[in-house]
């Protein structure tokens, strides 16, 4: 538009405003407003220096002359403009004294007369410059910024600070996509400015500024910064409504039409902010236009829709309630369309997120978006969803379409389904690009049930509890309680987790309680009111009471069904859970029909390879159920305190069904269990059942059938899981053990021997089986066959298993024959010791030596004991030497033990060598060989630390006091110092270690009580801490008994010879802690 035409329009507007002001009534406030308004206009028409002498002060005449001489020199114009800004514009000028505070606030930056003059001077110089340079962008930009400062106010921190803020925001946020709207909701645009001209008082200046922007855009229509600056003016809170509504919307549209598409998002950023501040239908239409270009901000648009919908739900005043019906209907229709539009948009976003074509700017998952849609549906059920009858018609129509036309898309709505009171619509057009369920402008309501089933339950099975309760809540909000109940029941029957079940059940129970409470309150209120028609009232009340009784009964049944419903959930989650099936049987109590049905269903559904442990127990319990005549028989059998006669009476009263039980066992033995032992347990329990009912022959036939091998047994391994358990069952030791026990109890000797021989043939017999077989033959007087079984056993097994067999074998052989077959016994002992490990030699050697002592030669016994000192392990060698010495002393005398002591000292470890030296020295002293004893003490001293092994040094000290001289005593002290230097270590560390060990041993002795009464207590100096520590360590380290009976080591012996034990007990006294060895003689 040309400038002259705009000036004429502005003058017309000014005259009209003046006429309105003149026609208004006079008042103090209006007088103040009129006084302020009279100051305007300042810039229209443009200030002319020829008509206003104040525009050019005397100091600026030289600059004016420079412009006259060089009118085309832009630098001269720029210098003059900078001079006027620096000399006239003040950032925060004080207002005029004649103005009140209120008037100064209305005028803002123009409250000072100097600033009004500065505005006129700036306008004059810029307009004259633009007449020379109408297309210069920098000139227009500076002019608009300076003019805007007088109208909009000063930016916070000044223009430089605002420029920095804009640059920083541009770096942090991109002008596209989800970050398009970066301002906080309800943010005031005016907070970025300080002050500003009131839109009513300074209407002329606001209009003049808008006209200036229009002129700039007429000359520079493609400059985006000019457009953005102009559009930002409409967001200012003091912008006049005449500019900030229709004019602003049209200006935004012109900007979008003028600027290229690459700059549109920068315009939309301001446009959408302006639309949100305007609100109403304008906001919705602007947002819809933008979402066609960029749907990424759909969530923001949905929040705007819901905010407007909630604003319409606010309580209205009495006057608004009295409006005509047409207007209220129109309002409800508009609000309903907003809720429906928001619902369809959210549904579309959720589906897009599920397909992976949409990512929420707020980081919401597809399920969160779907739950938001569900919550919106719960909040506005009448406006969004179909009625139950309409949903049924929808389903029928979908089925008809599928059968007639082959259509599989169940989401298409039939043409007869529409909102209440609307005309029929077509199902969908073939050319339509949007689905009716996600087309926001389509008024067709949604089939909520079908959507939740297809988009929710089928895709978010782990959140089914929330979805089912949401659907039920939707029907409750619509008043469809029966449909809600069916929904709860359907949810309970389909969920697979206890969490979802609990969520649904709690909501179901709470809803039932609320409905019952409401009906009871309603009946109570009706009982207090007096009605005219008593008969109708009575009939209505009876119907309501009947309905209340029905609902209360349903609620009680629901509470009673809860354990079964929880069990249903657990079985749906894992139908192979055997324990849950057992719990289900227990829940049915004495309902035999349900119990049988449950057992059969469990057997049918459980996969043996995936079943939890004890799947076989399910068959056993089922068989026992039939065996004892159902749940009543089982309950009587499990009752406590029942006598034998009472049990017989109960057995007579409740007859079992053995044929059905046998059928269950027949079914069980065909199941491919994971473990062979489970199948073996089935066979064993089957035989046990036959035994309980005195069917002994049937029991033996059952076990013989169970161990029957397959035709081809080659290559079958018991632990080969690739083969079915039925194929590997014939190698089950558990099954054979039960079979052989059954034969021993009910069969004859020959049949039992055949079973044992079959086990040995299959090489599945254990050492215990060998011993049991031999014991069975021995009990039946087959002694030699028993010994043959032992021989076969030691050939089958190696050590350490063979040790147990040898131990029992040798004990029984010696007990049977004694010295009658001595050479054979010797051969057996030599055979046992041939490959025996060192740790198992001691019991066999002691038994061998005892045999020679009792039935053979003492000399051979001594050789055996001497051989044992070399054959046994290091841990047993000391005890073996002590035993050997005791036997040698008792047989040949004390002097004969000297070579044994010498060999012991050479072969034993250092710690045991010192102990053996003490014994050797005591022996020599007993024989009167004092010098030999002293030499032995000196030899043993090198192994004894004086700090820790004080017993040795005390004994040597006492020995020297009693038998030595001053020289020998000094020699003993010299050796002690030498040894102490040899063991030179940290004394404090040793003391701490010894003290800790002593405290630990003392605590153990305190727990043992009086059992440690044999420990000797030495006299200890109470003032010496080291002595107390050593005494405690010495007490804790008390020596054990010197001799070990052979029977104590033979742990696997089935029966031990008491003679060996007696000898061992007698021998334990020999070589003990006694100083006197007269007991050896």
Curated annotation (Swiss-Prot):
Residues 311-326, 526-540, 1070-1081 have a biased composition (Acidic residues). One of its GO terms (cellular component) is U2-type catalytic step 2 spliceosome. The keyword Ribosomal protein does not apply. It is found in: Nucleus. Keywords: mRNA processing, mRNA splicing, Nucleus, Repeat, Spliceosome. Gene3D superfamilies: Tetratricopeptide repeat domain. Pfam families: HAT_Syf1_CNRKL1_C, HAT_Syf1_CNRKL1_N, HAT_Syf1_M. HAT repeats lie at residues 54-86, 117-149, 204-236, 243-277, 444-477, 479-514, 656-692, 711-745, 747-779, 781-815, 820-854, 856-887, 892-926, 928-962. Residues 1-27, 308-337, 526-546, 1001-1022, 1047-1081 are annotated as: Disordered. GO terms for biological process: generation of catalytic spliceosome for first transesterification step; mRNA splicing, via spliceosome. It comes from the Eukaryota. The keyword Repeat applies. Involved in pre-mRNA splicing and cell cycle progression. Belongs to the crooked-neck family. This is Pre-mRNA-splicing factor SYF1. It comes from Mycosarcoma maydis. The lineage of its organism: Eukaryota, Fungi, Dikarya, Basidiomycota, Ustilaginomycotina.
